């Protein structure tokens, strides 16, 4: 049983580089030669180094949720209320001066009007998206500091006006009416008789909410039919229609003070405004003193988000009314048997909201999916190995439809059989790029020889600059956990855990057998030998040099866990970002065998935190010498003392090496990154000869071990990927709370009342006290008492928040003293009645806590966590670019306006064939 708060990260073989970086590339100049066929055809082509893998609901966005993914296509084949649109491509010169940024605006997409009801009862209607005001340059030389800036409007009825933005601060109800006479398109590009209507948003909400099996069964589905649908309609390894698939984002609406239960009640969700159907979002607490959250809701939930991508209610209703007209296809676009159609297809035989919304059949295949976006999806072309997305002639924006300078087709090509060697793939791609056979190429994958070729003729190759701004992606993807998952019963521990007993005892205070038996506690990891061990190891490394090896000097280390360009978010309500405090939040401290802060002295100056600036001054003649931090010599001695103490306290393990093997979490490990990891492993053995660390790349013969590392925590490391719910450190901390079991850690800190730890980590101690105070004011109904959350068995602790185990019954094991999840006779977890939604509880806590803290205290907390939560070198966000403006390659005929935090804006791309 797996329940995640949301799908945060999706890893493809390769995503369009300009889209990933989320900023407009800028053409320096243009030459004129024979137009490539793709340019003449207004086609954008991208190629993957992997075969196409069909899956169910591949082209249907109506049962999905969360932030847009670069590797997805839904954002340009489907539509929702609103979108962001770029008005122009930026202009950045060779000196990296931004002469003109991309200006962008909010755009009424399917919405005709936005109606706001304010706290004083006033109703305001905004019926256009004019954005005629473009902000002036903010630098003294007449240039801009950012390459993407929002345009505004003086039109008081525009959603881009200052009046609208200010009104959101006092809004208690937001409604959308829908544009008239927008028709859906099928996979052949044909106009259907089905219109986009307000009710479509009700259907898409139900389709998304009913992803969760218990919700589905309560609304007409059954476990038996779920199993049938999973086996007959879905690809073999699919989680769809199982209890491992769930919708985990509803808590977010509660964080934004919305009554999400109303979304499931058609009479409350689809109301009337001036006689028209209006989709209605109502505040839960309308008290005049309650801070409105509609700005956050507007920014997070209505843009770059899949939650409200429509499903055609008219089409679904028609098929339910006339099932004889319906042809039912599996994920392979193959028609299913009449028996399966009877059991899972449309009709009036079944009742419930799941059947009403076509839960088992709508969108399973491309052929049963309808599109209201600027492009529509054709079925996969197995002859040419590509997916094609064609311009939708039925799209509501007729001016865009009739224009001849935008994209008519987006084509994604796939490998015929299996991946080829990565270096060979990029070598081929560069040739294709030069010939115009693919539209973009990641500059970071160029060899030095290829870069030299590019720089000789920048205009020909479409050389331009992009700006990398990261406001929303937390810099943690895989992290070491304080409590380790248990293996399946009867497992040979030598073939499961990727570390030995000495390592386990040092870091976790338990042997592998004790971990497997569910006896591990938090003590050693939080404030014992585990804290000393990992902080010494982290602080001993010169992460500046590690980044130099990994990225050839293009990046600087980022060991802080928060998004570097995200707002701090404190009570000052200013625009300070985490990156404004770069040296502080990326400084590392360490603690000796007794838990005391380690101090250093250099040139008469005493210090206890090693900053990147200090490490930049480290010199050496070999890579291993350069890998030493500014405190290396002291830390080496302190580690020797720690190990000596360990040997005395653990005589059966005395003299043993501390071994661990970690796998690189992704299948493609480039040579530079591998060299950096190999150098780090050798470095650790020189820090102390008993440290035997190994970083292993993925290979097919090790796939089982790699999967167990990645998904089952065999190295004590688990997936923690997280995208912000809104622009504030509060959301980044929220992700850590579930991702690295920070809630359990805070309870442990509060309960232990350890004077040494509390002195070393005063902000963590303050935080622990605060969350208990908050819980007193907002009591939780939990299967484990709040004050005992640090006593959950390590078998279930990671899943308590991450997978929603708090919805099930726990029982205290009298032998171990740990709380364990209870199961019925069939092996199913037993539900816990009226459980508090901890996702909501934690998110609300962080929102309130951070908004009341000063930025200075938030930075102190961030810095403490940089040290406390160890550095994970296989995390590819361990570094950030030295310069925000970096080179990129996009075919010189293409102009791409893009927006920070957005995916590749195919609709907004234009082609200049001159």
Segments from the language model and where they lie:
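Extracytoplasmic/periplasmic ligand-capture domains
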Residues: 181-190, 195-213, 374-550, 571-869, ...
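Aromatic- and charge-enriched surface segment that lines or borders ligand/interaction sites
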Residues: 110-224, 229, 524-529, 533-534
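N-terminal lobe/hinge region of extracytoplasmic solute-binding protein
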Residues: 47-166, 370
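Short, glycine/acidic-rich hinge or "gate" loops at secondary-structure transitions
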Residues: 217-227, 549-569
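Surface-exposed binding/hinge segments that line
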Residues: 171, 175-180, 194, 199-203, ...
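Membrane-penetrating hydrophobic segments
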Residues: 2-18
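Gly/Pro-rich hinge or "lid" segments in bacterial periplasmic/extracellular proteins
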Residues: 297-423, 427
């Amino acid at each position: 049983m797996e329940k995640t708060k949301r799908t945060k990260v999706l890893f493809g073989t390769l995503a369009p580089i300009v889209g990933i970086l989320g900023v407009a590339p800028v053409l320096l100049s243009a030459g004129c030669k024979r137009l490539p066929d793709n340019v003449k055809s207004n086609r954008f082509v991208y190629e993957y180094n992997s075969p196409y893998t069909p899956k169910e609901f591949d082209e249907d966005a109506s049962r999905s949720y969360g932030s847009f993914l670069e590797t997805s296509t839904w954002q340009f084949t489907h539509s929702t209320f609103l979108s962001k649109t770029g008005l122009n491509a930026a202009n950045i010169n060779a000196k990296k001066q931004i002469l003109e940024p991309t200006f962008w605006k909010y755009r009424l997409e399917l919405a005709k009007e936005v109606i706001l009801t304010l706290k004083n009862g006033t109703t305001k209607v905004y019926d256009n998206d004019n954005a005629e005001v473009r902000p002036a340059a903010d630098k003294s030389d007449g240039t801009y500091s950012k390459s993407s800036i929002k345009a505004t409007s003086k039109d008081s009825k525009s959603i881009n006006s200052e009046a609208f933005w200010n009104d959101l601060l006092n809004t208690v109800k937001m409604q959308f009416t829908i544009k008239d006479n927008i028709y859906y398109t099928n996979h052949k590009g044909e106009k259907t008789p089905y219109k986009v209507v307000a009710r479509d948003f009700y259907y898409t909400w139900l389709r998304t909410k009913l992803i969760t099996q218990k919700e589905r069964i309560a609304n007409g589905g059954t476990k038996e039919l779920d199993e049938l649908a999973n086996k007959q309609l879905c690809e073999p390894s699919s989680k769809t229609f199982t209890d491992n698939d769930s919708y985990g984002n509803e808590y977010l609406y509660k964080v934004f003070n919305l009554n999400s239960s109303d979304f499931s009640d058609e009479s409350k969700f689809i109301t009337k405004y001036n006689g028209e159907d209006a989709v209605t979002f109502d505040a839960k607490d309308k008290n005049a003193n309650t801070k409105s959250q509609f700005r956050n809701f507007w920014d997070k939930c209505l843009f770059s988000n899949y939650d409200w991508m429509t499903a055609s209610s008219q089409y679904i209703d028609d098929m339910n009314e006339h099932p004889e007209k319906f042809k039912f296809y599996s994920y392979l676009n193959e028609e299913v048997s009449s028996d399966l159609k009877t059991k899972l297809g449309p009709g009036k035989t079944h009742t419930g909201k799941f059947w009403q919304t076509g839960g088992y059949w709508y969108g399973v295949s491309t052929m049963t999916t309808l599109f209201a976006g600027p492009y529509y999806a054709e079925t996969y072309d197995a002859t040419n190995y590509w997916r094609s997305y064609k311009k939708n002639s039925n799209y509501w924006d007729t001016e865009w439809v009739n224009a001849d300078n935008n994209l008519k087709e987006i084509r994604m090509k796939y490998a015929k059989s299996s991946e080829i060697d990565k270096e060979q793939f990029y070598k081929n791609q560069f040739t294709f790029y030069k010939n115009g056979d693919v539209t973009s190429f990641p500059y970071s994958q160029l060899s030095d020889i290829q870069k030299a070729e590019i720089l000789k003729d920048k205009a020909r190759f479409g050389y331009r600059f992009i700006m990398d701004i990261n406001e929303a992606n937390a810099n943690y993807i895989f992290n070491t956990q304080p409590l380790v998952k248990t293996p399946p019963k009867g497992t040979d521990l030598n073939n499961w855990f990727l570390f030995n007993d000495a390592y386990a005892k040092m870091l976790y205070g338990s042997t592998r057998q004790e971990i497997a038996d569910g006896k591990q506690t938090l003590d050693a990891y939080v404030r014992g030998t585990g804290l000393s061990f990992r902080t010494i190891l982290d602080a001993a490394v010169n992460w500046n040099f590690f980044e130099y090896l990994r990225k050839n000097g293009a990046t600087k280390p980022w060991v802080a866990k928060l998004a570097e360009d995200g707002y701090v978010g404190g009570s000052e309500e200013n625009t300070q970002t985490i990156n404004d405090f770069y040296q502080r939040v990326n400084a590392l401290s360490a603690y000796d065998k007794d838990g005391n802060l380690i101090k250093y002295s250099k040139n008469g100056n005493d210090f206890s935190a090693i900053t990147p600036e200090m490490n930049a001054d480290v010199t050496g003649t070999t890579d291993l010498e350069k890998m030493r931090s500014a405190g290396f010599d002291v830390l080496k001695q302190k580690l020797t003392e720690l190990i000596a103490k360990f040997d005395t306290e653990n005589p059966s393990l005395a003299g043993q090496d501390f071994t661990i093997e970690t796998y690189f979490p992704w299948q493609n490990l480039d040579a530079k990154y591998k060299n950096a990891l190999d150098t780090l492993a050798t470095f650790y053995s020189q820090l102390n000869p008993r440290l035997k660390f190994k970083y292993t790349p993925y290979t097919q013969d090790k796939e089982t071990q790699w999967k167990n590392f990645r998904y089952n925590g065999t190295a004590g490391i688990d997936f923690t990927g997280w995208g912000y719910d809104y622009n504030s450190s509060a959301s980044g901390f929220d992700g850590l709370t579930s991702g690295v079991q920070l809630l359990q850690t805070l309870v442990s800190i509060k309960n232990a009342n350890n004077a040494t730890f509390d002195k070393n980590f005063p902000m963590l101690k303050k935080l622990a006290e605060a969350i208990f105070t908050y819980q007193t004011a907002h009591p939780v109904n939990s299967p484990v008492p709040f004050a005992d959350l640090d006593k959950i068995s390590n078998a279930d602790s990671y899943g308590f928040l991450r997978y929603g185990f708090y919805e099930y019954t726990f029982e205290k094991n009298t032998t171990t003293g740990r709380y364990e999840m209870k199961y019925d006779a069939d092996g199913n977890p037993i539900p816990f009645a009226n459980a508090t939604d901890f996702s909501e509880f934690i998110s609300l806590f962080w929102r309130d806590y951070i908004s009341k803290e000063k930025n200075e205290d938030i930075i102190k907390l961030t810095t403490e966590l940089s040290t406390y939560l160890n550095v994970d070198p296989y995390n590819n966000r361990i570094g950030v670019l030295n310069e925000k403006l970096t080179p990129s390659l996009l075919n010189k005929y293409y102009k791409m306006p893009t927006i920070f935090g957005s995916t590749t804006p195919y609709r907004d791309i234009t082609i200049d064939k001159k």
